[in-house]
Amino acid sequence: MRYNQFSYIPTSLERAAEELKELGFDLDLQKTAKANLESFLRKIFFHYPDSDYPLSHLIAKNDMDALSFFQSEQELSKEVFDLLALQVLGFIPGVDFTEADAFLDKLAFPIHFDETEIIKHIHHLLATRCKSGMTLIDDLVSQGMLTMDNDYHFFNGKSLATFDTSQLIREVVYVEAPLDTDQDGQFDLIKVNIIRPQSQKPLPTLMTPSPYHQGINEVANDKKLYRMEKELVVKKRRQITVEDRDFIPLETQPCKLPIGQNLESFSYINSYSLNDYFLARGFANIYVSGVGTAGSTGFMTSGDYAQIESFKAVIDWLNGRATAYTSHSKTHQVRADWANGLVCTTGKSYLGTMSTGLATTGVDGLAMIIAESAISSWYNYYRENGLVCSPGGYPGEDLDVLTELTYSRNLLAGDYLRHNDHYQELLNQQSQALDRQSGDYNQFWHDRNYLKNAHQIKCDVVYSHGLQDWNVKPRQVYEIFNALPSTINKHLFLHQGEHVYMHNWQSIDFRESMNALLCQKLLGLANDFSLPEMIWQDNTCPQNWQERKVFGTSTIKELDLGQELLLIDNHYGEDEFKAYGKDFRASKAALFKGKANQALIDILLEEDLPINGEIVLQLKVKSSENKGLLSAQILDYGKKKRLGDLPIALTQSSIDNGQNFSREPLKELPFREDSYRVISKGFMNLQNRNNLSSIETIPNNKWMTVRLPLQPTIYHLEKGDTLRVILYTTDFEHTVRDNSNYALTIDLSQSQLIVPIASN
């Protein structure tokens, strides 16, 4: 374990003493440091009628227990304080450590003893994470140190778990959206699942916009999947044009229906544990699946601003600008009289994507988004540089396949009976519009590109993204983060994992940082919290996070690739082609070992190479035919210890998100020896070699200059490392699988790897 503490708010002595007193700690500035520490320790053992007993189980020195120490005349020293602090945080002498000083250095322990600062040290200790993954104060509150009185209690600028999660209100309302996506002449109704604590005060809201939450149709999804085996189409030379079109919602009228009290209820919905954490701290949770999902009406428009509007309508309702009904019969309306109108959206992948889309509408009431692994351009999710390009791990998926997965109205047999025929017509229109044949950008994709509206974002923004996420690739967050207005507060966590949540990792206090931010933005707490704009997980060692100023630098280093002419054959033998088609992982293994159809260049680094941004391959290339697909991957190659990309559970249920509520495991990325690490990758239809909007012809056997931008990253390579460049055609995981008989030739003498270099 190593501390990377970004959530602690430095506090004055007076404020620290005041907050400790509010928690019931009997500390006094006139007492000695030793007396105050003893008083603190006895208080945290509140379960024991006799606190001598638990004190006797701690050691103050290697030869003295804590009870004996406090009964002695010995002075409090750094040695004693450190040893007791470690034990209070759950670290066991002789098990977790033998030498306290060395262990504290390894932990990067954030508290440095000064006898005159004991009150501040105790305050800081309470806000520091235990071995279990919870801060000490959260751990104590979870054990019942504070009663669940359904009111706010704050410590170090963060809300504590004092809302009773055993008496939650669970209710359903149906919000009227200014849409008619299924063309039935009726406004679409949007089902909203609300979970809120009982409270006399208006509550802020965490909203998870999740098209998955009302169920998914995996059978329809699997039937809709496309075969990837097809020839790469030769496209006509042309220029693509699109237009920016404002989404115009329908006009609704004020509702004059009576207020209803008898709301639909529910017992369970698959919740997001970060939401649960805030539910216990006085934040209502709502889950919304939007148009075309079970319990709602409308068509699943998948990624456009009509779908976004169905979520926006819910924020409007929370602020009194839209109508919600108690049921589909629409006999009574219901108002969000429990809400303070301020909303933060949460969630990963499609959920975070909807958060980004919502933010670009500039809707009033949306104070903040926490968007993890989020898409900012749907074209870049299902296409790349003029190619059909599947997200990592999902060959054959496309946006209409996702529509089938999430159109959960068809999971309700009655809805299927009444609406499926019309749904199939609308789905067919969507399938035609996305143009899987060419892979080109068009108006359909432009209408699902949130980047063009990034200037309209006015809420605070928090993004997290994995630099090993080949599902929602790093370009998605790179482009939206760098497009955000300079006038807003923005934050980015870049981790070394894949497509995963990071709120329950051991090495980073993400959850507590979000608590401080949300108390600022949604509760109006003046806590003086300041979070760095960008925090990056160091890839060279375990559990080390660093502040960064930018994602993407203009300083470059050009690396020569060699002097040879390299030939890349596209065609595989029939058996090999079929085998790779059945198991794309086998093709990846062969590729990384140099056993596939590829050109391979190894570069031994003579100095450190700190990459920050978008690596570009500038290549001199020719094709034997009038078509060509170019794929590339950059590897950190050779055996050494690296971070894994999938977090593993260190404990099973040590994190309590309330008071014995929604427990979850503590996780972390492992650090272990392996043979390589993918740094970046990229794909291109050579007919789109100049830009996305220009389709060019490919002259047979004529040299072309190609600039292939790879996925942006921040990655540190060290002197002596090997950087491996792999050039090839078909990627069996991502691209179409064209097995026609053509070849690419690369002139390495006129090719370079252009690397953006991080400044010191």
Swiss-Prot record:
GO terms for biological process: proteolysis. Transmembrane segments: none annotated. The keyword Disulfide bond does not apply. InterPro entries: AB_hydrolase_fold, Galactose-bd-like_sf, Pept_S15_Xpro, PepX_N_dom, PepX_N_dom_sf, Xaa-Pro-like_dom, Xaa-Pro_dipept_C, Xaa-Pro_dipeptidyl-ppase/CocE. It catalyses: Hydrolyzes Xaa-Pro-|- bonds to release unblocked, N-terminal dipeptides from substrates including Ala-Pro-|-p-nitroanilide and (sequentially) Tyr-Pro-|-Phe-Pro-|-Gly-Pro-|-Ile. GO terms for molecular function: aminopeptidase activity; dipeptidyl-peptidase activity; serine-type peptidase activity. It is an enzyme of class 3 (hydrolase). Its EC number is 3.4.14.11. The active site is at S349, D469, H499. Keywords: Aminopeptidase, Cytoplasm, Hydrolase, Protease, Serine protease. GO terms for cellular component: cytoplasm. It is found in: Cytoplasm. Signal peptide: none annotated. Removes N-terminal dipeptides sequentially from polypeptides having unsubstituted N-termini provided that the penultimate residue is proline. NCBIfam families: PRK05371.1-4 (NF003783). HAMAP family: Aminopeptidase_S15 (MF_00698). Belongs to the peptidase S15 family. PANTHER family: COCE_NOND FAMILY, PUTATIVE (AFU_ORTHOLOGUE AFUA_7G00600)-RELATED, PEPTIDASE S9 PROLYL OLIGOPEPTIDASE. This is Xaa-Pro dipeptidyl-peptidase. It comes from Streptococcus pyogenes serotype M28 (strain MGAS6180). The gene is pepX.
